[in-house]
Curated annotation (Swiss-Prot):
Positions annotated to bind substrate: 136-137, 274, 283, 292
Source species taxonomy: Bacteria, Pseudomonadati, Pseudomonadota, Gammaproteobacteria, Enterobacterales
Gene Ontology BP terms: pyridoxal phosphate biosynthetic process; pyridoxine biosynthetic process
Note, other: The active site is located at the dimer interface.
Family: Belongs to the PdxA family.
Gene Ontology MF terms: 4-hydroxythreonine-4-phosphate dehydrogenase activity; cobalt ion binding; magnesium ion binding; NAD binding; zinc ion binding
Residues engaged in binding a divalent metal cation: 166, 211, 266
UniProt xrefs under Gene3D superfamilies: Isopropylmalate Dehydrogenase
Named cofactor requirement(s): Zn(2+); Mg(2+); Co(2+)
GO cellular component: cytoplasm
Keyword Magnesium: yes
Cofactor notes: Binds 1 divalent metal cation per subunit. Can use ions such as Zn(2+), Mg(2+) or Co(2+).
NCBIfam families per UniProt: pdxA
Protein name as annotated: 4-hydroxythreonine-4-phosphate dehydrogenase
Length: 329
């Protein structure tokens, strides 16, 4: 890395395990400066509950970034709306969570931060606070005015991107249009090159129907939509293999010769990845004008403040963000 970069982190729901994980992250040295967008008392109280050392140093945007030393974090303060009891949701803090996301996103857009890593949020409590919120991905897409974003989850061994995300099954076939596939594959291909450093990405594409339609006998979306799009993009030089049946695609015969898989819908691709690497997975938002990674788990309210939360996914998310920063320099 040519110079030390700043990575901004949002802990997510303050009553969940996000603050625990941030404190655990701080117990090791990092080659980047970790700027945590959070309430100071929340972090110091949680560190005390866990019996771990934590020193907060103020964020100084005009000073050169410094590699993070063990036991310290750089704090970009955002005040809680209500005091926090670990494991107990407080509706007003839904506003606090969104404020942290907005500040972190804006900092990435204006060049303060090289990447953003998000901890788990509780969507229900944010909506209960009167803020329409469907998820991090949609929030950052709207705030950054990105034309289109793509959700991808990854482990060390496997990357799975989604053509559609949080849609009911009955709506998926209608949502998979030529325009959508062109856009999603273009973003996936571009970000594999620019953010992952893969010169010529090799992408496996799932069919929509069982057996990838069985030649039109189990649905015609492959013939009508997916195959024509893949043929057009192959003619442009993209290395695309598919459409392949999803029940046979996830095996070494195919995966050993691929850099990513494009699944047509959420529960087609993600169960395999989460079974293969749960606790080590990372959620990546492709198509944003900045690097964003996230943990692959929820708030785990029942574990907050008890010292039992597994920091593995957060460490993987941070390490991947650092690699992506290097690739984009």
């Amino acid at each position: 890395m040519v110079k030390t970069q700043r990575v901004v982190i949002t802990p997510g729901e303050p009553a969940g395990i996000g603050p625990d994980l941030i404190v655990q992250l701080a117990q090791r040295e990092w080659p980047v400066e970790l700027v945590v967008c959070a309430d100071a008392t929340l972090l110091t109280d949680r560190a005390a509950m866990l019996g771990l050392p934590l020193t907060l140093r103020p964020y100084s945007p005009n000073s050169p970034a410094q590699p993070q030393t063990a036991g310290t974090l750089t704090l970009l303060p955002v005040a809680l709306r209500e005091s926090v009891t670990a494991g107990q949701l407080a509706v007003e803090n839904g506003h606090y969570v969104v404020e942290t996301l907005a500040r972190a996103c804006d900092g990435c857009l204006n060049g303060e931060f090289a990447a953003l890593i998000t901890g788990p949020v509780h969507k229900g409590v944010i909506n209960d606070a009167g803020i329409p919120f469907t998820g991090h991905t949609e929030f950052f897409e709207e705030r950054s005015q990105a034309k289109k974003v793509v959700m991808m989850l990854a482990t060390e061994e496997l990357r799975v991107a989604l053509a559609t995300t949080h849609l009911p099954l009955r709506d998926i076939a209608d949502a998979i249009t030529p325009a959508l596939l062109h856009e999603v594959i273009a973003i996936l291909h571009h970000d594999l090159r620019t953010k992952f450093g893969i010169a010529e990405p090799r992408i496996l594409v799932c069919g929509l129907n069982p057996h990838a339609g069985e030649g039109g006998h189990m649905g015609t979306e492959e013939i009508d939509t997916i195959i024509p799009v893949l043929d057009e993009l192959r003619a442009q030089g993209m290395k695309l293999n598919g459409p392949l049946p999803a029940d046979t695609l996830f095996q070494p015969k195919y995966l050993d010769n691929a850099d990513a898989v494009l699944a047509m819908y959420h529960d087609q691709g993600l169960p395999v990845l989460k079974y293969q690497g749960f606790g080590r997975g990372v959620n990546i938002t492709l198509g944003l004008p900045f690097i964003r990674t996230s943990v692959d788990h929820g708030t785990a309210l029942e574990l907050a403040g008890r010292g039992k939360a597994d920091v593995g996914s957060f460490i993987t998310a941070l390490n991947l963000a650092i690699k992506m920063i290097v690739n984009t320099q």
